[in-house]
Swiss-Prot record:
The lineage of its organism: Eukaryota, Metazoa, Chordata, Craniata, Vertebrata. Residues 311-334, 416-488, 548-589, 664-694 are annotated as: Disordered. The chain crosses the membrane at residues 18-38, 70-90, 131-151, 205-225, 231-251, 261-281. It comes from Rattus norvegicus (Rat). The keyword Membrane applies. The gene is Plppr3. Residues 562-575 have a biased composition (Low complexity). This is Phospholipid phosphatase-related protein type 3.
Length: 716
């Protein structure tokens, strides 16, 4: 019965099975059988004639007729062939029936079927033919080896003189004078007996019986399971004892000498062991060919999305402080970072950490700083191209280039603010003051640029070799390394990714802003001289509006409590250099959910201005501009007054900007607010006190502030 698994399995095709069987194996076995016939049953080959001693008693043993032997030759051949062959067939049948369901589970399983010549040969048929065929060939080979040795040696059997009946008178001399006779002086009439008496070494019974016993015993040892503790030993001992009996009968019946039997045992056992190990592979099935399964591909999307926001803060120190790539990989022409377009469904919330580092310099707790934002993250494969994984952005520390970028940024914001509110919803008395303010801002910017150019010519050019190196890390965000610089000129890094107009202001919020302005105008009785809000980037104009309204109304004072966050205890960050001059200011245009962060001096931590305490006297803002002049001080502009780094050239770290809403001191110009407050400060909030605001009072206060600022610039 063939198992279902065997039936369902597709058989293999073999082109060499039948040709080898028909043209190689069968001819060899047939030739051995034919040779054995001529050697055993015919007198075509005569044994060698060997001399003997006169009246040798060892050769004068009684002769037992062939039909009187305990195990005649034909019986020996049949037993040596039939018993092992029957045992092999029965064993293969049992193995096929019991182990057919274990196909492919190990090297000892049943072999699969093979198609050859249009016929399907299952494992039982092929294994049986193979093992029995090798056994038959071994028997023939053993008999041939024995006959060849016997014919070559011609040793006499113990009954040689009995069947030869030598005639000593034919010698012409007496046995005493010549005891060793080499002539043929046999006078017996049984020529067949005389011929067989000349072939005794080795014993044919011993060789054939030993071969059969050893061959079938090795088969039992290989096929029968160890679960049967006694079956295997019983079968092995049975065949071994039978072989021993066959050999010993030759000694007891004086058919062979003891040495002939022992030699026959050795020859037969050696042939059997060789064929069992090398011809049939110790009766084991060949190992099944296992198709190598390809390694499962890494699911980059699954790995990337499983990295949550909390896991980024639990990484060890080695992960967050990986060294940058080799200089050869980072150097070269700046190239844009490739971005993959994926569906919104693959976006996951992850943490983007930015580390500000100063390489090869001592670490300080006060100088260590880091901040993180939670941004949507596009899932990308974990194994990126090295060219995409590392990038180098060279930003020259040229003041003119920085001013050019800032002016372009301001120009874009001014153009966007011109399209902020629809004409039908904006009254004329609100648009006219806005145009005046814009013109004043442009004039001030031109004057400031001229002054900065003159100062730059006096100071001299900045070395062009000071470039910050930014390495983009897919998992932990960009890492900025600041090379040391000799001069005090700061580097202003402005993100190139600008939020497009119309990306952050909803129709509801714009409508609410218009309604508040209309109500404020009705209460104040006159137009308000402020710039209209920028489309989508609404916080800078809204901040000016709130400050102006609060000053006019004389609302309650509020003072923010600054909370310093020094991340020196975190194992994920590295502190910058102790040198105050080598610093970098990064404006994050992607973080709409965090307040503005300013970089303090090397001995002071970062300060966040978020919490508002009611009942105090002013608004204390974070250091929005991050750079201040330290030479001269005007009355009304203290160390904490906000001066944007857009309008200043010399840095002064560690200051806090304070705006007194009651007196109007510290009010930043619109250009400074636009330069300092970009997309990164949209979410910073202030309590607004809406009150009546007079047009003349606002204009007078703004005019006085501008005059103080101009006087300070001229003094610097």
């Amino acid at each position: 019965m063939i198992a279902k698994k065997e039936k369902n399995k597709t058989p293999k095709d073999s082109m060499t099975l039948l040709p080898c069987f028909y043209f190689v194996e069968l001819p060899i076995v047939a030739s051995s059988v034919v040779s054995l016939y001529f050697l055993e049953l015919t007198d075509l080959f005569q044994p060698a004639k060997v001399g003997f001693q006169c009246h040798d008693r060892s050769l004068s043993m009684p002769y037992v007729e062939t039909n009187e032997e305990l195990i005649p030759l034909l019986m020996l051949l049949s037993l040596a062939f039939a018993a092992p062959a029957a045992s092999i067939m029965v064993g293969e049948g049992m193995v096929y029936c019991l182990q057919s369901r274990l196909w492919g589970r190990g090297p000892g399983g049943v072999e699969g079927s093979i198609n050859a010549g249009g016929c399907n040969f299952n494992s039982f048929l092929r294994r049986t033919v193979r093992f029995v065929g090798v056994h038959v060939f071994g028997l023939c080979a053993t008999a041939l080896v024995t006959d060849v040795i016997q014919l070559a040696t011609g040793y006499h059997t113990p009954f040689f003189l009995t069947v030869c009946k030598p005639n000593y008178t034919l010698l012409g001399t007496s046995c005493e004078a010549n005891p060793y006779i080499t002539q043929d002086i046999c006078s017996g009439h049984d020529t067949h007996a005389i011929l067989s008496a000349r072939k005794t070494f080795p014993s044919q019974h011993a060789t054939l019986s030993a071969f059969a016993a050893v061959y079938v015993s090795m088969y039992f040892n290989s096929v029968i399971s160890d679960a049967t503790k006694l079956l295997k030993p019983i079968l092995v001992f049975a065949f071994a004892i039978a072989a021993g009996v066959c050999g010993l009968t030759q000694i007891t019946q004086y058919r062979s000498h003891p040495v002939d039997v022992y030699a026959g045992f050795l020859i037969g056992a050696g042939i059997a062991a060789y064929l069992a190990c090398h011809a049939v592979g110790n009766f084991q099935a060949p190992p099944a060919e296992k198709v190598p399964t390809p390694a499962p591909a890494k699911d980059a999307l699954r790995v990337l999305t499983q990295r949550g926001h909390e896991s980024m803060y639990q990484q060890n120190k080695s992960v967050s402080t990986d060294e940058l790539g080799p200089p050869g990989r980072l150097e070269g022409v700046p190239r844009p970072v490739a971005r993959e377009k994926t569906s919104l469904g693959s976006l996951k919330r992850a943490s983007v950490d930015v580390d500000l580092l100063a390489p090869r310099s001592p670490m300080g707790k006060e100088g260590m700083v880091t901040f993180s934002n939670t941004l949507p993250r596009v899932s990308t494969p974990s194994l990126d191209d090295p060219s995409r994984r590392h990038m180098t952005i060279h930003v020259p520390l040229d003041a003119s280039r920085s001013r050019q970028l800032i002016s372009e940024w301001k120009q874009k914001s001014l153009e966007g603010r011109g399209l902020g509110l629809p004409d039908e919803a904006s009254p004329a008395h609100l648009r006219a003051p806005a145009e005046q303010v814009a013109e004043e801002e442009e004039e001030e910017e031109e004057e400031e640029e001229e002054e900065e150019e003159e100062e730059e010519e006096e100071e001299g050019p900045v070395p062009p070799s000071l470039y910050p190196t930014v390495q983009a890390r897919p998992g932990l965000g960009p890492r900025v390394i600041l090379p040391p610089r000799p001069g005090p000129q700061p580097l202003i890094h402005i993100p190139e990714e600008v939020v497009q107009a119309g990306a952050g202001l909803s129709p509801k919020s714009s409508a609410s802003v218009r309604a508040k302005w209309l109500s404020m105008v009705e209460k104040g009785g006159g137009p308000v001289a402020v710039a209209p809000p920028q489309p989508r980037v609404a916080n800078p104009p809204r901040l000016l509006q709130v400050i102006a309204m609060s000053k006019a109304a004389g609302g309650p004072k509020a003072e923010t409590a600054s909370s310093s966050s020094a991340s020196s205890d975190s194992s994920q960050y590295r502190s910058p250099s102790d040198r105050d001059s080598a610093s970098i200011v990064t404006i994050d245009a992607h973080a709409p959910h965090h307040p503005v962060v300013h970089l303090s001096a090397g001995s002071t931590p970062w300060e966040w201005k978020a919490k508002v305490v009611e009942g105090e006297g002013g608004y204390e803002l974070g250091d929005l501009a991050r750079g201040f002049r330290s030479s001269c001080k005007q009355p009304g502009i203290g160390p904490g007054s906000p001066v944007s780094d857009v309008d200043q050239e010399e840095p002064r770290f560690g200051a806090v900007a304070t705006v007194n809403l009651a007196t109007g001191e510290g009010l930043p110009p619109p250009g400074a607010s636009e330069g300092a407050l970009g997309a990164g400060s949209r979410e910073s909030t202030l309590r607004r006190q809406v009150g009546a605001l007079g047009e003349r009072e606002v204009e007078a206060e703004a005019e006085s502030y501008y005059r103080r600022m101009q006087a300070r610039r001229y003094q610097d």
